[in-house]
Design a protein with these regions (language model features):
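Metallo-beta-lactamase
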Residues: 133, 157-158, 165-167, 182, 219, 225-300, ...
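Gram-negative bacterial Sec-dependent N-terminal signal peptides
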Residues: 1-27
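Conserved beta-strand hairpin/beta-sheet module of binuclear metal-dependent hydrolase folds
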Residues: 123-184, 309-313, 317-323
Length: 678
């Protein structure tokens, strides 16, 4: 892996159960390391599953209902054809998508390095090709990207639900269905929610001019554009770095590495775009007929995404569940970092859909996973997931109201046994441990009310004290190895983590901690948790990934970012210590869209207010928003725009130059674990 060129492409974080295109780290194809030798570990320092891990996996095999094959039957149902290829190339020349890198999952072997429940999910997500959902009417192309792309057959063309993440994968899906079923134009696109794996491929399906003219309706829930960009801008760089762990970006596709992403195999690495919709769904329930197809949209804000909607097709008795009901319990808190979601609101929206549509639906399909057929089956899945989200909320708060804290709940909360026997309620994307902590964080915050944890020492400051009191590095290593040999992995990483913080260059300690993390990763049912432990093990052994400087954000995302949001981001990127003695009042005007702002620097802080102009500004900058976008994308500068006659400065520009010089260009190159900076 270290001998390959690592390309790091940084764009603005876009939210999502996945961190889309914001930090695409790839080698020469979509799999950083060939998975050719699946019987051996890809890492020379890697370890096989221990006897304790094998015992844990066998216990899973004995306790869960593996004889229930309904999911597999549904995942196969309606299959029409698979493409002759398993790779899709990106316009840039790299491999955008490589389904074949996961073929090791199709050999029928049970891997002790993969939790059996997760392996089952990983196999289900190997669906690849064209599927019929409603005869002659609704089709899906699965396995071309992280999400599914759905084609509704209208009177004259295709109505597309969700566009995949990349232009290249979306175009490949459209070409494939047209090849198999006859060429039809795209006459409308519906985007279910504001995550990039559902809108990023839009340019592979339509021309922007046809959307802008209104020829092709592009429909999305209200708030879509705001949340498509803004949900994660403020902490985007930190999320990008953390995404390396949650999504296992550097892990080879291997039984010892990356096997799945819970809601699909992986994220494509192609050309991501964004076109502003020309029709928004604003009401709780709203009906439209497009190309002869009747639809009722159910707005579900605050569920899996801040802007999201389900759709009911009364002609077909078909319910589209967006990403609200898929083949897993979702993240309430995503490990890369994001605002905590509300499981109670999620449960209520499922319940609303159940009573409005679920009791009459013949098929339920979604943007990920596989459809469910038959009304009894549909209601069973809807009720199970409704109850799982509600139970998470209610049982955690029940415990919290009896004194269980955020630092204890992960060891207390358990899904009811009646739900554990239903595959639809397993947490491949979330986990009981981190979702339960998220609920407490949502209602009570991070503090457990113990003064000792209110303003604790930083780990690097407390670790030497622990090491001294435990008798030094040698004793910790002996005890850590003993705990490892006993299969007491959580106890082992509790003390070894202290040692690594105290001695970041202690290779033996880092290697032993990596061995511990690896076994924990093997055992975990959640793909994100598995990836996080295995990625941590890799970085402890080999250091952080290296790569070329990040590429600038794409033009579609820049256009979608409001000027106000960009100015607020500058406030975050400002190194206040470099302008501690400065005060600046700046008027900014963008005549082409009629916006104006006051930007003020004082007390090492940058603040912004929209719709105002200061009477005594130190500097007034006037330029069109379309020209400002070049500055936002770092493709030009204010000085260059002034020289070109595209911007005017009225007043003293020197304080502004000092301000811009104090803006920090964030890069996701910081350590997550001590001693891993190469």
């Amino acid at each position: 892996m270290h001998n390959k060129t690592l390309h790091l492409a940084l764009a603005i974080t876009l939210g999502s159960g996945i961190s889309p295109m914001l930090f695409a780290a790839v080698a020469n194809d979509a799999n950083p390391e060939p998975a050719a030798t699946q019987n051996s570990h890809f890492d020379s320092k890697g370890k096989a599953p221990s006897s304790y891990t094998i015992e844990a996996q066998n216990a899973v095999r004995k306790t869960l209902p593996f004889a229930d094959n309904r999911d597999f039957e549904e995942a196969r149902k309606g299959f029409i054809a698979a493409p002759s290829y398993n790779k899709i190339m990106a316009e840039a020349g790299n491999v955008a998508w490589n389904m074949g890198s996961y073929d090791f999952l199709l050999g029928g072997k049970d891997y002790d390095s993969i939790n059996p429940s997760l392996q089952r999910q990983a196999v289900l997500n190997m669906a690849f090709g064209l599927y019929e959902v409603v005869p002659e009417k609704i089709y899906q192309v699965r396995g071309f990207d992280l999400a599914n792309i759905t084609f509704i057959k209208g009177d004259t063309g295709w109505i597309v639900f969700d566009t995949l993440m990349s232009k290249e994968t979306a175009k490949a899906a459209l070409d494939f269905i047209n090849e198999k079923l006859g060429k039809r134009p795209v006459v409308a696109i519906v985007i279910s929610h504001s995550h990039a794996d559902h809108f990023g491929g839009v340019r592979g399906l339509v021309d922007e001019a046809d959307v802008r003219s209104g020829k092709i309706p592009l429909i999305a829930p209200t708030g879509f554009m705001e949340h498509a960009v803004a949900e994660n801008v403020y902490a985007g760089n930190a999320m990008t770095r953390r995404a390396f762990f949650q999504y296992g970006v550097m892990l080879p596709h291997s039984p010892y590495g990356h096997v799945d992403m819970a809601i699909g195999k992986n994220a494509s690495l192609g050309n991501m775009g964004l076109i502003e919709p020309n029709r928004y769904i604003e009401k709780d329930f709203e009906s439209l007929t497009i190309d002869g197809v009747e639809m009722e949209f159910q707005s579900t804000p605050g569920t899996e995404a801040p802007a999201e909607m389900n759709t009911w097709f009364p002609q077909f008795k078909a319910f589209w569940a967006a990403e609200n009901i898929v083949g897993t319990i979702h993240n309430i808190y995503t490990l890369r970092g994001a605002l905590v979601r509300d499981p109670l609101v999620w449960s209520k929206n499922i319940n609303n859909a159940l009573y409005r549509y679920g009791q009459q639906a013949d098929v339920m399909f979604a943007s990920h996973s596989w459809p469910r057929w038959g009304n009894e089956r549909i209601q069973d899945v809807m009720r199970a997931q409704r109850d799982a989200y509600a139970n998470l909320n209610n049982a955690v708060l029940h415990a919290a109201n009896q004194g269980v804290t955020i630092n204890e709940i992960q060891n207390v909360y358990k899904l009811p046994e009646s739900l554990k026997n239903n595959w639809a309620t397993h947490s491949y994307h979330g986990s009981e441990e981190h979702n339960s902590r998220a609920v407490i964080n949502r209602y009570l915050g991070y503090w457990d009310a113990n003064p000792a944890t209110l303003m604790p020492l930083s780990p690097k400051d407390s670790a030497p004290l622990y090491m001294e009191m435990m008798g030094g590095a040698d004793k910790i290593m002996v005890k850590g190895k003993s705990l490892f040999d006993q299969g007491k992995y959580r106890e082992a990483y509790e003390i070894l983590n202290k040692l690594v913080y105290a001695e970041p260059q202690n290779t033996q300690a880092k290697d032993l901690l990596a061995d511990v993390y690896e076994q924990v990763g093997y055992q975990k049912e959640s793909a994100g948790v598995r990836n996080s432990f295995l990625a941590a093990a890799y970085e402890l052994r080999h250091g952080m990934p290296k790569g070329v400087p990040p590429k600038p954000t794409g033009p579609d995302m820049i256009r979608a970012m409001s000027t106000e949001l960009w100015l607020e981001y500058l406030g975050i990127a400002l190194d206040g210590s470099k302008v501690a003695d400065q005060h600046l009042v700046l008027n900014l005007r963008t005549p082409d869209n009629g916006e104006q702002f006051v930007v003020e620097l004082s007390n090492s802080t940058l603040t912004t207010i929209k719709g105002q102009q200061a009477k005594k500004a130190d500097l007034t900058i006037t330029l069109d928003r379309s020209d400002l976008e070049g500055v936002m994308a770092r493709k030009t500068s204010f000085a260059q725009l002034v020289a070109a006659g595209k911007a005017t400065f009225e007043g003293d520009h020197k304080p502004f130059e000092r301000l811009m010089a104090a803006i920090t260009p964030f890069t996701p190159t910081f350590e997550l674990l001590p001693g891993t900076q190469q």
